[in-house]
Amino acid sequence: MKNLFLTSSFKDVVPLFTEFESNLQGKTVTFIPTASTVEEVVFYVEAGKKALEKLGLFVVELDVATESLDHIAATLRKNDFIYVTGGNTFFLLQELKRTGADKLILEEIAAGKLYIGESAGAVITSPNIAYIQSMDSPKKAEQLTNYDALNLVDFCTLPHYNNIPFKKITQKIVADYTKSLKMHPISNHEAILVRDEEVITKLANGKTD
């Protein structure tokens, strides 16, 4: 059973998350902020943490770039959910591959563990992340040899669609790739809910598209 909750801004879609997963009180979340560690703007990391804690969840932070594979494996297996924050998608993918955390995350998801991907964390579920190059700099991941990602879904999530300061660049990405890729653009108030092969995009006020 594949359970994915993909979003641009978790704090803005909390009601959608509680609809998607209601059994939250006292559960533990492996919180992976790795993508944000090479960025200057990181307010969303604390905002995501606080939103989770308000739901009664216990947050266990895990920076895969600085931990051993044994520690990463034990943490991912022990906790109930996996949450991957935003930041630089290329650096995130590089570190997941370098450490082997990518395979561990895929194993946990295959076993039914809920994965929450915010911004970069949503983008890496795509088959390949080359489409996000104009929003994120690949230069922050010099050891990354290819852009093949987790391939959990057959579409490409584009976060922050039509939101400032990404309005023009997200529109351009859609225009450039819409014919060659299966694009799923979402605003900060939308989330993509995936249960096995069922994929639904929802707006935080209850509308679907």
From Swiss-Prot:
GO terms for biological process: proteolysis. The active site is at S119, H160. Pfam families: Peptidase_S51. Keywords: Hydrolase, Protease, Serine protease. It comes from Listeria innocua serovar 6a (strain ATCC BAA-680 / CLIP 11262). InterPro entries: Class_I_gatase-like, Peptidase_S51. GO terms for molecular function: serine-type peptidase activity. This is Uncharacterized peptidase Lin0382. The lineage of its organism: Bacteria, Bacillati, Bacillota, Bacilli, Bacillales. Belongs to the peptidase S51 family. Transmembrane segments: none annotated. Its EC number is 3.4.21.-. The keyword Ion transport does not apply.
